[in-house]
Amino acid sequence: MKLAVVLFNLGGPDGPEAVRPFLFNLFRDPAIIGLPAIARYPLAALISTTREKTAQANYAIMGGRSPLLPETEAQARALEAELARRAPDVEARAFIAMRYWRPLAKETARQVAAFAPDEIVLLPLYPQYSTTTTGSSVKDWARAYKGPGKSRTVCCYPNAPGLAEAHARLIRQTWEKAGKPSDIRLLFSAHGLPQKVVDAGDPYEAQVQASAAAVAALLPEFTDWGISYQSRVGPLKWLGPATDDEVRRAGAEGKGLLVSPIAFVSEHVETLVELDHEYAALAKESGVPVYLRAPAPGVAEPFIGTLAEAALGALDRSGAAPFGPWLCPAAHGRCACRNGGTA
């Protein structure tokens, strides 16, 4: 049997000249800006032009390009090795389909079709489902892929045991390496969303809460923990509390902070710049006595094991379903399970 596992992620510019087209692709997505195309495209052009210089400065901190693709390639190779170990009779290959920069779904679709798989598993590198991330990628893939193979989607895995274990290990290692500082708050920081997206039935916030609770349950030494949301932009009300507000609150209370990127499985601009530079500087200004940041799971063995289990476990079904103990409550009407994987 030939198995293609298609890993979805955001993508990132591979050089300064790619920043504007990357931003344009992002903001022309109707899942991000819900306007008709006749209005959305000019607005995307305006936003990408006005934000280009600031974004280029952020990527310059990381060497002028996003590390997301090489990080994802390392995860793909680790997943292939784990699949070969667990299922030696399966010829499994992991492919990468980025949403907003290369390799885009059209390019990856050609590669998958040339591989001619019997089975396809669509596996997002977003543990928590949102219509703005996984939902958008699944729709994009459906438009791009017309090749062979029976397909199904792992829509989410927010509280899968291996994911929680990977985060918990990295948090504990970060704390121990720093000398086990006392009076420290564990802050799970996730990418934010406009509140209206969640109010419309998107399950993302509930799944972030489930992820954080699963990790915290493995870390009894951290009795003080919370959740915050980063990357807020524009005038709309966003999920809260905001990470910058929580940094200021910790400073006012004299608390140290250990920040874990609970919604991210790879290092990229939101971890390496926003958390490591912007919020670290804010913590210093705000009087936070200790500011630590745990790494994203990357190729940590429990996380790669989760991806392998999710892929192999999906082979006996069709459609979209979560991996692990998660099940969306009925209030989340835009979850993937109720909408063919896309919402």
From Swiss-Prot:
GO terms for biological process: heme biosynthetic process. Pathway: Porphyrin-containing compound metabolism; protoheme biosynthesis; protoheme from protoporphyrin-IX: step 1/1. Transmembrane segments: none annotated. Fe cation binds at H191, E270. InterPro entries: Ferrochelatase, Ferrochelatase_AS, Ferrochelatase_C, Ferrochelatase_N. One of its GO terms (molecular function) is metal ion binding. GO terms for cellular component: cytoplasm. It is found in: Cytoplasm. SUPFAM superfamilies: Chelatase. Pfam families: Ferrochelatase (PF00762). Its EC number is 4.98.1.1. Keywords: Cytoplasm, Heme biosynthesis, Iron, Lyase, Metal-binding, Porphyrin biosynthesis. It catalyses: heme b + 2 H(+) = protoporphyrin IX + Fe(2+). Catalyzes the ferrous insertion into protoporphyrin IX. Belongs to the ferrochelatase family. This is Ferrochelatase.
